[in-house]
Amino acid sequence: MRSLPTVHTEFSELVAPTKRGRRFMLPMRPGFSDCAPGGRMRLDAIAGWLQDIAYADVEDAGLAQVAAWVVRRTRIRVHRWPRFSERFAVTTYVSGLGRMWAERRTDIVRDGAGAPDVEAVSLWIHLDRIEWHPTTLTDGEIAAYGGAAPERRISARLRHPPPAGAESAAWMFRATELDIAAHINNAAYWQPFEQELLTGDDPEQIDVEIEYRKPALPGEKQVLRDGPHRWIVGEGGEMHASIAVAGDSPGPPPAS
């Protein structure tokens, strides 16, 4: 099994659901384009599931036209990799609220299994649909989602450190990775780390967190690497995202 240095700083908590409050589930299966050559589901594909079920939940609640949501941070903890064509129940629920943001938990549970193969938690920023500026949650949104975690207040503060003395490698974001917001979709930011994973044997498990900063456009970027940390930066040095590997996660081999 491969390993790499890991960080032991604070990661977003994986909060269990309460007995009350809204939960939303969809059946899902990893397809051909979701999986690595060995058959496991890739992290960028898992991130795609997270955003898809988040929107499906908002739409099902009748709130899709109230606001736009953009992801600020996501932690993905893989206990067992989902594999090609397996069937899963993907369940999501709100696990915390802030004034202009909310935290959403998602569990990916294989058919016939009791515990999740994957646990994830994301921080989403609440934006108005015209100017795309942060705005306070509406009474209707709080009524729909507040019951899941009415007393758990969360912060939108980012935690990952800035780069210092890191190795650098080129990366290219493509125009085909733009989404309807006209910037690189959040799932694509996982691809540089996934490319490292694909250089060797698949890790059995992983626990990794990404923070999104300045939205990226297509073009050449740099991926900085220092132990358990990765940073995706633009040509002018602006930071687009940072990645940290938690605990004792296996991962890519050290850079040669």
PLM regions and their residue ranges:
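Hot-dog-fold acyl-thioester-processing enzymes
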Residues: 2-72, 119-121, 126-206, 253-256
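A conserved acidic, glycine/proline-rich C-terminal tail/linker
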Residues: 196-224
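HotDog/MaoC-like acyl-thioester-processing domains
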Residues: 2-10, 21, 73-161, 212-219, ...
